[in-house]
């Protein structure tokens, strides 16, 4: 099950012997992402590479450095060179749908890890991003803000997971007439910590009154870290920041009592493990259930940060 896969991954057990362990031997697998600079994307790509190589596969990790046009072009390349499988990591398949259709037409299986899912793909392993958004937003609005105040949203809507978290934010804020959204700002994916720090510093200058900003909702941890740095620099340490991902630096900042008060920890190894297991089944000729598979996530606050 998804939960079992996630638990095993969380405890560091990559039990990759559940399917025919020779099924992947000699297969050429293309692990493709535009976001290898992201700590968590890198972690997932590395986990998949190591596990599939342990099964005898030849794994190529291809990073296009935030360039979706280049990603599209590289997908065409691996399809024409006859790859045996594609794993799309942290990338919206809708943005490369035409190229993926070429893979489907060539009977090349496509798996997603922290991506979206489109018809033709086998599986996308992810978190339930809407539910994660709901978890963090309700904690922010109810527990941290007490149902009132102002909030800034730092987002990156090209990422399918971030979009779902933002949709949860958009839906829930309607239920809180005493919470006003000051602005939503797009944070580029290349240097999200630095960019969010700069964006936040500018917003603090534009809202100089100490009480003018109550909270900052960051749709993932890097901008939350950047925002917390800007707040510390400006001496605005009463402003509350939340993130999503549970990356190491963010969890440490929560423990240290910074402005960053909470995040939702995604089980990235759990996602990567689900993908590896499903690939083993696929290449062993077993039927797999197509669609999204979820690795469970948890709310991290100062009480449980480790």
Protein language model regions, located:
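Hinge/cleft segment of the Venus flytrap/periplasmic-binding protein
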Residues: 7, 12-25, 161, 172-175, ...
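Flexible loop/hinge segments that line or gate small-molecule binding clefts
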Residues: 93-131, 135, 150, 247-256, ...
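Short, low-complexity disordered leader/linker segments with a strong preference
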Residues: 1-28, 54, 58, 101-108, ...
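Hydrophobic alpha-helical
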Residues: 76-80, 85-105, 169, 189-252
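Extracytoplasmic "Venus flytrap"
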Residues: 26-52, 59-73, 77, 81, ...
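Short, solvent-exposed amphipathic alpha-helices that sit
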Residues: 40-55, 132-136, 161-180, 195-199, ...
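Short beta-strand elements in bilobed, periplasmic/extracellular small-molecule ligand-binding domains
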Residues: 53-64, 150-153, 175-193
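Hydrophobic alpha-helical segments within soluble ligand-binding/sensing domains
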Residues: 23, 71, 125-151, 163-164, ...
